[in-house]
Structures are given as C-alpha cells and as structure tokens.
Regions:
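N-terminal, positively charged nucleic-acid-binding surface of large information/translation enzymes
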Residues: 1-150
Length: 150
C-alpha cells in the first residue's frame, strides 16, 4: 500500500517556531514508521506563501509579500535539516510548477461546473484565518482568541 504523509503547509509570515517543529516531527515519526514496515511513503511539507497573514506581516515590516516569503521559506527548510526530518519533497506555493498545477486543477473544477460566482458574508479573523459562526463571536464582534475586531 502507498501512503501520502503531509504536514500543514506553514505560513511564512514569521520565522519557524516550536509549533512548526512539533507537527513536522509527528508527521516524520509516522513516515519513518510506515517505511520501517516496508510501506511506500511520500512525505511532503512546505510553505503557504499566500494569504492575508503574509500580506499583513509584509506590510508591517515594510516589504513585499514575495520578499518576506523569500526570506523566511529557507528558514523553514533549515528547520527540517536541524531536526533531521526525512521528507521527500518541500513545496513552496509560489513555485511556478506548483502555480501551474493548481491553475490546471482549478480550471478542471471550473469546467465541470463546480465553481460559480456568488457572495458570502461572515465574521472573519485574519489571525485565525477562518470565518467564525455567530456562536463563536465574543462581545463587541471580536475574536474570542485574539481579541481583535472581526
């Protein structure tokens, strides 16, 4: 049997920290275990170089998002070496091959009628990077975790 093991793809809005190492080590343990059992394993990790957290961090540092991710992504790769992770591939979402493949997949989804134009309204926390339901919102329409306005 073949196994695909992955970590989250990490935002590169800041340097890597213990949380990044923790989840990567967990995935590495699983990949190593499956390989020891003789299983075919493909283990991937990498960086998500798009999104509001990256834009906000770049603006705060007076740089462009691309400059920020180009500075921080190698730090994530260096972390993998430092903790001796056995990943097979490191993905950067700004890699041209990745961009082309994603565009191809999205085109197929669109061509099959699964993408449509519409509107969505909701309470969004950029630090959580998700929408909050009415039952999750703190007093004053704030994020209960980050205490910022939504």
């Amino acid at each position: 049997m073949s196994y695909y093991v992955t970590t989250p793809i990490y935002y590169v809005n800041a340097e890597p920290h213990l949380g990044h190492a923790y989840s990567t080590i967990g995935a590495d343990i699983l990949a190593r275990h499956m390989r020891q059992r003789g299983e075919d394993v493909f283990f991937v990790t990498g960086t998500d170089e798009h999104g509001e957290p990256v834009v906000i961090a770049a603006e705060a540092q007076g740089t462009t998002p691309q400059e920020l991710v180009d500075r921080n992504a190698p730090r994530f790769e260096a972390l993998l070496e430092r903790i001796d992770v056995t990943n097979d591939f490191f993905i950067r979402t700004t890699n041209p091959a990745h961009v082309a493949e994603v565009q191809k997949v999205w085109q197929q989804i669109y061509d099959n009628g699964y993408v449509y134009k519409g509107q969505y309204e909701g309470w969004y926390c950029p630090k959580c990077a998700d929408f909050k339901g009415e039952h999750e919102i703190a007093e004053g329409n704030t994020c209960p975790i980050h205490k910022i306005p939504l």
